[in-house]
Amino acid sequence: MVDARLPDGSRVNAIVPPLAIHGSVLTIRKFARDPYTMDDLVGFGTVTPKAGQFLAACVRGKLNVLISGGTGTGKTTNLNVLSSFIPDGERIITIEDAAELQLQQPHVINLEARPPNAEGAGEVRIRDLVRNSLRMRPDRIIVGEVRGAEALDMLQAMNTGHEGSMTTVHANSPRDALSRLETMVLMSGYDLPVRAIREQITSALNLIMHLDRMPDGRRVVTALTELQGMEGDTILLQDIFKYRTMPGDGRLDGELVATGLRPKFLDRLAEVGVEIPAKAFRPPAPTNGAATPARLRTAKVPKMSTLARPERAR
């Protein structure tokens, strides 16, 4: 069994008998030569233009974002796209188990964890890299995925001046993502009360972007959810955008629409000069017919690059 990386950045996994009972298996995970943009995600039907502009504003306004979803839903791809809206002047540190992010800014430091050798020595964990990154004067920390105790260090980094940081987590819903984070923080070895963990989470995170994979293979954003604080021992969540399904063409179709609720963090964005027009949160008029499929509807939208992408330094 081996896990390796090719010169072009592709990931290779190979497993042979007797571990692979019916014969050797070689898996190659290739990446796009040119990183996807928000225009691409809109064209794929992953996100709507309104939601795309909202996400770009959240990144420029240095909100802390958690991307959640199941396996193969496009979490890393969307993390890479959101990271493209970080201004060029900021110092960014990326931390991954296996390097996949393709940030194009000039001040990016890429760190990669290292597994132990055959003798069980030499391991460098994601958690070790997160802790070390705090000594490297980052403006933002991007962790490819939190799977264990490093969740606590990531939350603490978000709470100690590293605003605008982002990461991903495997989860089935925004609420499930918070439960997963709680479990991972408890894996850190610190005997923290559950309420203290939840307060840490609500203080650190501003927005959850949740992705799902549709039965036809499309990957779509199904919720953009704000964390609004605590009520008793419960974390309050509010959907700003929500995927609305409607029957059409013999299968479920739908679109990501505004719920009509304005996020509390708008004032914070305004303080740093990032404005989101009120019409972005206006819900669509109710319709009696089926929703227009996102993959068809998005073919006529304007380019996001002229609306939301920050200027690159020349």
What positions do the PLM features span?
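Conserved P-loop NTPase nucleotide-binding/switch module
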Residues: 96-109, 133-232
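P-loop NTP-binding catalytic core
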Residues: 1-61
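NTP-binding/hydrolysis catalytic cores, primarily Walker-type P-loop NTPases
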Residues: 217-314
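Hydrophobic anchor at the beta1->P-loop junction of P-loop NTPases
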Residues: 67-69
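P-loop NTPase switch/communication element
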Residues: 31-43, 60, 80-131, 155, ...
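Walker A (P-loop) phosphate-binding loop of P-loop NTPases
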Residues: 72
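Conserved lysine of the Walker
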Residues: 75
